[in-house]
From Swiss-Prot:
GO BP term, pick one: translation
Provenance organism: Cryptomeria japonica (Japanese cedar)
Name of the protein in question: Small ribosomal subunit protein uS11c
Subunit-structure text: Part of the 30S ribosomal subunit.
Localization annotation: Plastid, Chloroplast
NCBIfam families attached to this UniProt entry: PRK05309.1
Gene: rps11
Amino acid sequence: MPRRATRRFLPRKTKHRILKGVIYVRASFRNTIVTVTDTRGQAVSWSSAGACGFKGTKRRSPFAAQTAAANVVDTLVNQGLLKEAEVMISGPGPGRDTALRAIAQSGIQLSYVRDVTPMPHNGCRPPKRRRV
């Protein structure tokens, strides 16, 4: 008689206290995405200006970036999951400063803030300029 394959159903997400994490702020010209990971790089929570209800050109505003950053950080602080964080800011968008300000005002102790915007050392040729 053939043996039946049994599957194990494990919970997908386990709630674990990270206490120390890394907050990545990706500020593009159109949107701002904030991701919180643990020290190993496993994503714990995320938010963006579009996910907070801002649509169209309102997504690129500094207020939308502030709302997205405050949203993701407040959920983790209220659950007691995050006490100390490192902040990595990437991109040239208008919401990078206000997102950092919202993270600093949330009560999380920031160990350091680093700008990791990729800058070419004269690598690839950029695309031609738009003419509108």
